[in-house]
Amino acid sequence: MKNSSQIQIIRLQDNLSSIRKIAGWTAEDLGEKIGVTKQTISNLENKKSPMNLTQYIAIRSVLDYEIENNKENTVLPQVITILLDKADEFDEKDYTNLKEAISAVSISAAGGVAGATLASVFTGVLAPIGMLGAVATPIGAIVGETSYWIAKIMKKKDEKQGRQ
């Protein structure tokens, strides 16, 4: 059985390509931000290499920074919340539908669509699959939660080391 840190790492790796594109980054951009090559990012996205905890923390940190400092990209925090932070709140079918919808939005983002237009694409893709209502609560819960993921990891590490 996988622990919660492993599940979070797998979720990020499974969705890294879509998240990166919605952030507006190339593989090279993300690699530069975390100190690895674009080939390393490609290998993570294509699952040629497993993502480790250090890579997870580095990527989540730059994503948090982007969310805090790029208020024009309103889709990124929603996608992070849906695919990573609140994924357990969806049944498997809904989560799969959301992943597919977000993947479609990421294609628009990779093509240069950004800001309010990307937000419209995001809403437009969710509406036909009946997921707008399903994501309303998780999206509303974004405020103040952009770094709670690291608290969960550190708490687990502290518990393993006998610290409270």
Locations of regions flagged by a protein language model:
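The alpha-helix within a helix-turn-helix
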Residues: 20, 31, 60
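Intrinsically disordered, low-complexity tails and linkers flanking structured cores
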Residues: 84-164
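DNA major-groove recognition helix of helix-turn-helix/homeodomain DNA-binding modules
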Residues: 53-73
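Short alpha-helical DNA-recognition segment
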Residues: 24-42
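A short, Lys/Arg-rich alpha-helix, primarily the initiator
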Residues: 1-21
